[in-house]
Amino acid sequence: MSEIRALIVDDSSVMRKIVERSLRQAGLESLVVHEAGSGAEGLEVLKAKPVDLILSDINMPSMDGLEFLRQIRAQNLAPGVPVVMITTESSEEHVKQAIQAGARGYIRKPFTADQVKERVLPLVRAA
């Protein structure tokens, strides 16, 4: 698989590293990772750098992941780029909101590398 550029957005630096490690364990060895600690920071990264995949938490201060996703779509910052929400939010309402906002996948924390592989690799291959 060729180089994959991923943006990981989470207010926890530890969680960003866990997501990155899980992506590599899922088979994305040639991974270039851009990190953002908030939705607003994520938007700035997208304005400056092209990406192939976006993974975002929902619960973040100032701009939550759903608003981040809505802004990506409204500003046309990453057309066609799959977005996967990775979050502790597990209600069906949150899943529905994420899908309606444009998410292509949803992973509940805590998660395993196998779950990341099952949900992310098909999106990367299809992109």
Which residue ranges define each predicted feature?
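Helix N-cap/capping motif at the beta->alpha junctions
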Residues: E35-E44, G65
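Two-component/phosphorelay signaling modules centered on CheY-like receiver
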Residues: S13-H34
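Receiver (REC) domain active-site loop signature in two-component systems and cognate sites
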Residues: M60
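C-terminal output helix
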Residues: F111-L121
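Active-site residues of response regulator receiver
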Residues: D57, T87
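Short amphipathic alpha-helix used as the core "switch/output" element in two-component signaling
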Residues: E44, L66-P79
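Active-site beta3 strand of CheY-like receiver
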Residues: K49-L55
